[in-house]
């Protein structure tokens, strides 16, 4: 079954996201704290005619880290080279990328926490002093070659900032914590998307979609497309609050933005473990999901919305979880 509330990009969504991507900070909706800081740092770097300090963007998937990287490059008026941690398998791959940079370029590395340690270590001198030392040849004939690099800005994006080594994390002069979006910001994003794709939607429908999109623009845009389909087949094409509710109910997205996987997690905790505490590994086995998937994709939203608490002995379902799913609590 397709999980419509998965915050990772699926299929042609990356193409759609590029179409919707704002170009400048003034067009970027939400994340005001990060934007306000970046605006000052970017203007100061341009005033001094220097490259911007290296930037680390971290937070849950689907919140616009990649979009923000492109916006930063546009604000600086420079080129952006894009890659990802898993794509850089060995040091030579990174050396080739670094050697291709022009002065002032932005190098964007998505999922930077997934780079091998040997590759990561190449970045240390590159980030701090704009040079790398590479080994040429093998055995007794090998020699070290010093390679100067032009000043550049590295933007790293990660969903798991805690997995970055201390030496790498310390080399980022700017950090931006991307947080779940407020409903009013998501409503504005949904209305903007609808306008770009010439969809007819009421404000009430956009607000309802925002409320059930887990604070995540990627999910909001995905659900909007499915609600549009429902409106075209089951209605007259207008996306109103009634059509929206029926479509999202069909997709198993409830009024709190929880889908069948979220509810399965909560029901398992309540029915099998009396609400907890239960270890993450045990819970993952019971719902047939990878531990990392539960920790990265499902748990953050459930914690943020107050359905789950983390304790020293494990995860615990809250009173709100019991009430939301219609369970009576007998352990109090």
UniProtKB/Swiss-Prot annotation:
<dbReference type="InterPro" id="IPR027417">
    <property type="entry name" value="P-loop_NTPase"/>
</dbReference>
<feature type="region of interest" description="Small ATPAse domain (RuvB-S)">
    <location>
        <begin position="182"/>
        <end position="252"/>
    </location>
</feature>
<comment type="similarity">
    <text>Belongs to the RuvB family.</text>
</comment>
<keyword id="KW-0227">DNA damage</keyword>
<dbReference type="GO" id="GO:0016887">
    <property type="term" value="F:ATP hydrolysis activity"/>
</dbReference>
<feature type="binding site">
    <location>
        <position position="291"/>
    </location>
    <ligand>
        <name>DNA</name>
    </ligand>
</feature>
<dbReference type="GO" id="GO:0006310">
    <property type="term" value="P:DNA recombination"/>
</dbReference>
<dbReference type="InterPro" id="IPR036390">
    <property type="entry name" value="WH_DNA-bd_sf"/>
</dbReference>
<feature type="binding site">
    <location>
        <begin position="128"/>
        <end position="130"/>
    </location>
    <ligand>
        <name>ATP</name>
    </ligand>
</feature>
<feature type="binding site">
    <location>
        <position position="310"/>
    </location>
    <ligand>
        <name>DNA</name>
    </ligand>
</feature>
<dbReference type="GO" id="GO:0006281">
    <property type="term" value="P:DNA repair"/>
</dbReference>
<dbReference type="Pfam" id="PF17864">
    <property type="entry name" value="AAA_lid_4"/>
</dbReference>
<protein>
    <recommendedName>
        <fullName>Holliday junction branch migration complex subunit RuvB</fullName>
        <ecNumber>3.6.4.-</ecNumber>
    </recommendedName>
</protein>
<keyword id="KW-0963">Cytoplasm</keyword>
<dbReference type="InterPro" id="IPR008824">
    <property type="entry name" value="RuvB-like_N"/>
</dbReference>
<dbReference type="GO" id="GO:0048476">
    <property type="term" value="C:Holliday junction resolvase complex"/>
</dbReference>
<feature type="binding site">
    <location>
        <position position="66"/>
    </location>
    <ligand>
        <name>ATP</name>
    </ligand>
</feature>
<dbReference type="GO" id="GO:0005737">
    <property type="term" value="C:cytoplasm"/>
</dbReference>
<dbReference type="InterPro" id="IPR008823">
    <property type="entry name" value="RuvB_C"/>
</dbReference>
<dbReference type="Pfam" id="PF05496">
    <property type="entry name" value="RuvB_N"/>
</dbReference>
<feature type="binding site">
    <location>
        <position position="312"/>
    </location>
    <ligand>
        <name>DNA</name>
    </ligand>
</feature>
<keyword id="KW-0233">DNA recombination</keyword>
<feature type="binding site">
    <location>
        <position position="181"/>
    </location>
    <ligand>
        <name>ATP</name>
    </ligand>
</feature>
<feature type="region of interest" description="Large ATPase domain (RuvB-L)">
    <location>
        <begin position="1"/>
        <end position="181"/>
    </location>
</feature>
<feature type="binding site">
    <location>
        <position position="67"/>
    </location>
    <ligand>
        <name>ATP</name>
    </ligand>
</feature>
<dbReference type="GO" id="GO:0000400">
    <property type="term" value="F:four-way junction DNA binding"/>
</dbReference>
<dbReference type="InterPro" id="IPR041445">
    <property type="entry name" value="AAA_lid_4"/>
</dbReference>
<comment type="subunit">
    <text>Homohexamer. Forms an RuvA(8)-RuvB(12)-Holliday junction (HJ) complex. HJ DNA is sandwiched between 2 RuvA tetramers; dsDNA enters through RuvA and exits via RuvB. An RuvB hexamer assembles on each DNA strand where it exits the tetramer. Each RuvB hexamer is contacted by two RuvA subunits (via domain III) on 2 adjacent RuvB subunits; this complex drives branch migration. In the full resolvosome a probable DNA-RuvA(4)-RuvB(12)-RuvC(2) complex forms which resolves the HJ.</text>
</comment>
<dbReference type="Pfam" id="PF05491">
    <property type="entry name" value="RuvB_C"/>
</dbReference>
<keyword id="KW-0378">Hydrolase</keyword>
<feature type="binding site">
    <location>
        <position position="315"/>
    </location>
    <ligand>
        <name>DNA</name>
    </ligand>
</feature>
<dbReference type="InterPro" id="IPR036388">
    <property type="entry name" value="WH-like_DNA-bd_sf"/>
</dbReference>
<keyword id="KW-0234">DNA repair</keyword>
<feature type="binding site">
    <location>
        <position position="20"/>
    </location>
    <ligand>
        <name>ATP</name>
    </ligand>
</feature>
<keyword id="KW-0067">ATP-binding</keyword>
<feature type="binding site">
    <location>
        <position position="62"/>
    </location>
    <ligand>
        <name>ATP</name>
    </ligand>
</feature>
<keyword id="KW-0238">DNA-binding</keyword>
<dbReference type="InterPro" id="IPR004605">
    <property type="entry name" value="DNA_helicase_Holl-junc_RuvB"/>
</dbReference>
<feature type="binding site">
    <location>
        <position position="21"/>
    </location>
    <ligand>
        <name>ATP</name>
    </ligand>
</feature>
<keyword id="KW-0547">Nucleotide-binding</keyword>
<comment type="function">
    <text>The RuvA-RuvB-RuvC complex processes Holliday junction (HJ) DNA during genetic recombination and DNA repair, while the RuvA-RuvB complex plays an important role in the rescue of blocked DNA replication forks via replication fork reversal (RFR). RuvA specifically binds to HJ cruciform DNA, conferring on it an open structure. The RuvB hexamer acts as an ATP-dependent pump, pulling dsDNA into and through the RuvAB complex. RuvB forms 2 homohexamers on either side of HJ DNA bound by 1 or 2 RuvA tetramers; 4 subunits per hexamer contact DNA at a time.</text>
</comment>
<feature type="binding site">
    <location>
        <position position="65"/>
    </location>
    <ligand>
        <name>ATP</name>
    </ligand>
</feature>
């Amino acid at each position: 079954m397709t999980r419509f509330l998965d915050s990772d990009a699926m299929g042609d969504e990356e193409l759609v996201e590029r179409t919707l991507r704002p170009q400048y900070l003034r067009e970027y909706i939400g994340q005001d704290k990060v934007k306000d800081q970046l605006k000052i740092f970017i203007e100061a770097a341009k005033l001094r005619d220097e490259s911007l300090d290296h930037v680390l963007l971290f937070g849950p998937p689907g919140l616009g880290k990649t979009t923000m990287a492109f916006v930063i490059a546009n604000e600086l008026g420079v080129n952006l080279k894009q890659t990802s941690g898993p794509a850089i398998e060995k040091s030579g791959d990174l050396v080739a990328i670094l050697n291709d940079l022009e002065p002032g370029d932005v190098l964007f590395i998505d999922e930077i926490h997934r780079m091998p340690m040997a590759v990561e270590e190449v970045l240390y001198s590159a980030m701090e002093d704009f040079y790398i030392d590479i080994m040429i040849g093998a055995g007794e004939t090998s020699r070290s070659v010093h390679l100067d690099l032009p000043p550049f800005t590295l933007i790293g994006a990660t969903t798991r900032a805690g997995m970055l080594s201390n030496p790498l994390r310390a080399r980022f002069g700017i950090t931006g914590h991307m947080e779940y979006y407020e409903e009013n910001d998501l409503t504005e994003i949904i209305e903007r998307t609808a306008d770009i794709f010439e969809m007819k939607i009421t404000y009430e429908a956009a607000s309802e979609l925002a409320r059930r999109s887990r604070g995540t623009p990627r999910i909001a845009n995905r659900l909007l497309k499915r609600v549009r389909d429902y409106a075209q087949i089951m209605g007259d094409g207008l996306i109103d609050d009634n059509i929206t509710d029926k479509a999202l109910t069909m997709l198993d997205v409830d009024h709190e933005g929880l889908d069948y996987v979220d509810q399965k997690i909560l029901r398992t905790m309540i029915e099998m473990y009396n609400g907890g505490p239960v270890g993450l590994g045990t819970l993952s086995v019971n719902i047939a999901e990878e531990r990392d998937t539960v920790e990265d994709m499902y748990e953050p939203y459930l914690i943020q919305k107050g359905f789950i608490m983390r304790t020293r002995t494990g995860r615990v379902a809250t009173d709100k979880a019991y009430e939301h799913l219609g369970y009576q609590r007998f352990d109090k």
